[in-house]
Structures are given as structure tokens and as C-alpha cells.
């Protein structure tokens, strides 16, 4: 469902989900019974029910609260690092950019809100992989491998390094692995409110700063930012 197609029939849902129509019919019947879908008799189609709408509304409010609280310290860190600080949310095998702040000293860095970036090669994604439960991470790595068998050896090596880095220094790194001219580090957190796992990264142009500056100077501030945000979202945080 989206703004253009507010009503869908079983056949349309089956085509979009690549499921047998009989399976979809059983699912839509059940979802209608529990309030997640509403059946429109005139068109014999379905639209989102009250339970779904309220659930999505609550998720949106939670997401807006994360963005509102994260924005000021993210901008401060972007100015300090002379780079870009991004807030990303995991969605399947990708990360979605939710918010980003850029220093005026880093005009070449750009990441649009809503853009998808890969899990395996970005600091944002590697940080999320590092904090996932082992069984969930194993399943996700299998899906990532199936998406890119040819490039998997290199991707896997980068992921394993990111996991090791997270254990040793509290963040995952991507030094030119996703974008050759950008070095980045990231820390993950669980925002609560029904939202999926998130992470915050700080990226700087390779030509501006060495990885050592990111690890020695930026990393402690990034970790403090994320820990404050996590505690602030449950009401116990003190501004970093």
C-alpha cells in the first residue's frame, strides 16, 4: 500500500509480494479479523485498518523524537570533525538514511535523507551487524552472501574486521570501503519505541583527515553522543 494505491485486491497483493493468491487470501482474511486491514465491499479490495494506521503513527512519532534529540549533538560533532554525521536505520539488508548533518568544511560529502546504503561495506551497516544477536546476524550474512556471491569474500572480510573493531574500540570502521574518498566510523544503538536498530556514523573526506583522527579524537565523542541519545530516549540522559 502507498499513497497512490490505497486499496488493493488479493491478486494485486499476490503479485507485489510474489505469493500464491490462495496464501494471500488467507492472510488478508486473518489481517482483516484482527484490524490490520479493512475490507471494502464495493470494490472487493482492502485498505489499511485502524490497527495498522495507529501502529505506523506511533512509529513515526518515535522516529521524529529520535531525530529531534539527535540533531543538535550530531551537528556539533559534524562541525568538530569537519565532516558529515549520519543517522541510519536498518531495513532488511540495507540501511536507510534518516538524518544527516554536514560541516561547512565538507561540501563534497552528501547523503540524501531516505537514501539506502549497503550493510556490508558502510560503517553504518557494520556497526548494526556488530550488535545483532549471533543467530540473527548469521541469517543476515547468508542473505547478504546470496545477493553478491562474487563480491562476498571481500565483503565478508570487511564485515569481520568491523565486528572485531566494535569489540576492541567500540565502533566499526569503513576506510574507503564504500566510497573510496571517504573514511567513516559508526556506533549502533537500540532506540526503542518499536523502531529497528539504528546507528550513527561520522565520515570525513580522505583528503582532509587521517583515520587516526577519527579513531583518536572523533570516536570518543561519537560513543558519548550515542550513549547519551540511548539514555535520553528512555528519559535518563544528560546532554553530552
What residues fall within each predicted segment?
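Juxtadomain coupling helices with adjacent low-complexity linkers
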Residues: 156-159, 180-181, 196-240
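Short, basic/aromatic recognition patches
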Residues: 69-77, 141-187, 232
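Sensor-regulatory modules in signal-transduction proteins
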Residues: 189-192
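N-terminal helix-turn-helix
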Residues: 1-64, 227-235
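Amphipathic alpha-helical effector-binding/dimerization core
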Residues: 42, 47-143
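An N-terminal domain-start capping segment
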Residues: 1-8, 74-97, 224-240
